Amino acid sequence: MSSEILDQLESKIRQAVETIQLLQLEVEELKEKNDQAQQANDALRNENEQLKVEHNNWQERLRSLLGQIDNV
C-alpha cells in the first residue's frame, strides 16, 4: 500500500472515531432527556391519581348533601 492510501485510511478512521464519539455523547444526552421526561411523566401520573381521588371525594360529598336536601 502506498503512503497516500494509508493516509486516506487513517483520515477515514479518525473521522469514524470522531463520529462515534459524537454519537455517544448524543446518546447520553438523549438518555438524560428520556430520564427527565420519565420523571415528569411519573409526577403527572401521580398528580392525576390524586386529582381523581379528590374528584371522587367531592362527588361523594355532593351526593351526600343532595341526599340530605332530598330528605328535607
Curated annotation (Swiss-Prot):
Residues 1-72 form a coiled coil. Its main location: cytoplasm. GO terms for biological process: division septum assembly; FtsZ-dependent cytokinesis. It comes from the Bacteria. It holds the Pfam family ZapB. It is found in: Cytoplasm. Keywords: Cell cycle, Cell division, Coiled coil, Cytoplasm, Septation. GO terms for cellular component: cytoplasm. Homodimer. The ends of the coiled-coil dimer bind to each other, forming polymers. Interacts with FtsZ. Belongs to the ZapB family. Non-essential, abundant cell division factor that is required for proper Z-ring formation. It is recruited early to the divisome by direct interaction with FtsZ, stimulating Z-ring assembly and thereby promoting cell division earlier in the cell cycle. Its recruitment to the Z-ring requires functional FtsA or ZipA. This is Cell division protein ZapB. The gene is zapB.
